[in-house]
């Protein structure tokens, strides 16, 4: 299973959700678990990003917010967990 690292902004986003909306924080935790197992398929409609964020992927947290991450063989780095790209 891949290890998970948070960019400082992504960690702040996650802490925001823990304080503001526990249901969304649980959804993010579930998405991260899925990403650890299979970063390119599963819940949240994973899609590769283009342009500046080429090489990153996103999954839907809800209609407004996305979880943006980059997956390697041994680790996953979370870039954002709030707003749209």
UniProtKB/Swiss-Prot annotation:
Top EC class of this enzyme: hydrolase
Residues at the catalytic site: 47, 84
GO BP: any one term: negative regulation of DNA-templated transcription
> Which Pfam families does UniProt cross-reference here?
YoeB_toxin (PF06769)
Which InterPro entries is this protein grouped with? RelE/ParE_toxin_dom_sf, YoeB_toxin
- Say yes or no: keyword Repressor present: yes
Q: Name one GO molecular function term.
A: DNA binding
Record bears the keyword Transcription regulation? yes
Conditions for induction? Expressed in log phase cells. Induced by treatment with rifampicin and gentamicin as well as by nitrosative and oxidative stress. Expressed in human macrophages 110 hours after infection. Induced in the lungs of mice infected for 4 weeks. A member of the relJK operon.
Its keywords, alphabetically, are: DNA-binding, Endonuclease, Hydrolase, Nuclease, Repressor, Toxin-antitoxin system, Transcription, Transcription regulation
Q: EC annotation?
A: 3.1.-.-
In terms of superkingdom, the source organism counts as Bacteria
Effect of inactivating the gene: No visible phenotype in culture or upon infection of mice. Significantly fewer persister cells are generated following exposure to gentamicin, levofloxacin and isoniazid.
State the protein's purpose: Toxic component of a type II toxin-antitoxin (TA) system. Has RNase activity and preferentially cleaves at the 3'-end of purine ribonucleotides. Overexpression in M.tuberculosis or M.smegmatis inhibits colony formation in a bacteriostatic rather than bacteriocidal fashion. Its toxic effect is neutralized by coexpression with antitoxin RelJ (shown only for M.smegmatis). Overexpression also increases the number of rifampcin-tolerant persister cells.
Q: How is the quaternary structure described?
A: Forms a toxin-antitoxin complex with RelJ, perhaps RelJ(2)-RelK, in which the toxin is probably inactive. Also interacts with antitoxins RelB and RelF in vitro, in M.smegmatis coexpression with non-cognate antitoxin RelB increases the toxicity of RelK while little change is seen in the RelFK pair.
Q: Which family does it belong to?
A: Belongs to the YoeB family.
Q: Per its record, how is this protein called by name? A: Toxin RelK
| Gene that this sequence comes from | relK
């Amino acid at each position: 299973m891949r290890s998970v690292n948070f960019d400082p902004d992504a960690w702040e986003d996650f802490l925001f959700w823990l304080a503001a909306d526990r249901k969304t924080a649980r959804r993010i935790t579930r998405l991260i678990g899925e990403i650890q197992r299979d970063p390119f398929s599963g819940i949240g409609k994973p899609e590769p990003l283009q342009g500046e964020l080429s090489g990153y992927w996103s999954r839907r947290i809800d209609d407004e917010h996305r979880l943006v991450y980059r997956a390697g063989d041994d680790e996953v780095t979370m870039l954002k967990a709030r707003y749209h790209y």
